[in-house]
């Protein structure tokens, strides 16, 4: 009695364990099918509603591992709502589990060809018989549905007696282990098969694309299964897995599927989220790129309301968009850049675009119609001279303060074209006597035009009145060009004019060698071209003046560029003023001694010019006998 009772208890425990394995096999099979046929939550169907499954896998973290995931050593992502559609706990293991994968398509209005274009087989045969049309609640739209897959999981217990008689030969523990291992292999085969069928292509397209499609996949677990007709079943293909033998029967798994060769995307519409319209290089990011032939308008064009502020564009609250002119001016660094135009460089800007402090003095000359100078398209210096004078945008004027003498400073207005000829330089000089004019002229021009090196910006022409061309400074702002309204043009200072009676012998010593640069910007060269000019300068420093200056009412002006930034090419040209100069007489012996010294200086100068500078102008002197 005891042995039979123990045998019955063992059989009951083995049967309970087998039923639990079968129950978990059904649940895991359903989970695998729903996981590969239910779109993620991020995907949307044609109605815009979100799907129910989450893409997070249950095996991603240890806290999310459920007891069911340990079965068959296969963890899947969660599909709670899909699993709720089939209450597997209330179903009997003797009932088959049927899962239909339905493709729901909503064709376009007036378009009935969606069915034919969406599903085709490899041979090109169209499937129309499997579609069912039903109307919505409003009755205005129809939905075409077609079952593209049908999975059947069932437990066949017709050979229970045979299995019981043959199973007595084996131990119960070995039978359960073999059953569990075979069920694990079958589930892994199912996991691979669901990803090889054509419906998985639709599933991936719905999940990976950011589109709202006119079709969707809907897995269903019907309580009442409608069998296929013979025609429908003939159009579908069947695949059956190898059944798993158990102590009470066997587990069977099969699938009916359609051969879908292509899923057309013609019925898809763009997704509703906002597009990035103002990406880099987009016409919407720069409104002027969209309209390259806009007429010239004063001020900045209105920006689009949805445009965002970028680091690569101009601030909408401070400046206008970049210029689209064919001849841009990259050297202007002011924050109020105007919208340039090829034919509008001479037009004045709108009064609202001009700052208050510069509205009166800056733009009338810059946009004057008489100036035919256009800025170069590159920041490099222009290779041609300015045809009509010097524009105010070329170089900043130089402030020439007077030296710290007791007399007042005298400022001489510049000439129209900055002529450096002898007549232009002598124009502001007061009328002298017949005997005094010759000495003054010789004193002014005996040093010559080459006793100091001119800056690179000064280019004397072949005519008697050379003009000066300047290179633009790429780092100069608009405000630097209009600092001093009294000096609109640069001046050129001659070294012999900045000395007086008391400071002539030591003026160059205090200032340094004549060959050293006069200012910190390095505008003047550091060395002369030959030694003859240097010897001439040293002789001029030591030579006493022909006549003594008895009046100190007027002093020459000294050019100072300490306040100017380094690297800016600025040239000063100034003429001496002799309104208060009175000349005194000297002895004849002193005059003859100076005459001999000036002859020697003349010979040195002519010799140096003939060897080093053949194009220099011959210097004449009234003392040439």
Curated annotation (Swiss-Prot):
Involved in autophagy in a nutritional condition dependent manner. The ATG1-ATG13 protein kinase complex regulates downstream events required for autophagosome enclosure and/or vacuolar delivery. Becomes a target of autophagy under nutrient starvation. Connects autophagy to plant nutritional status. Disruption phenotype: No visible phenotype under normal growth conditions. The double mutant plants atg13a-1 and atg13b-2, or atg13a-2 and atg13b-2 are hypersensitive to nitrogen or carbon starvation and show early senescence. It comes from Arabidopsis thaliana (Mouse-ear cress). Belongs to the ATG13 family. Plant subfamily. This is Autophagy-related protein 13b. One of its GO terms (biological process) is protein transport. The keyword Transport applies. Residues 322-332, 455-477 have a biased composition (Low complexity). It is found in: Cytoplasmic vesicle, Autophagosome. Keywords: Autophagy, Cytoplasmic vesicle, Protein transport, Transport. It comes from the Eukaryota. PANTHER family: AUTOPHAGY-RELATED PROTEIN 13B, PTHR13430.
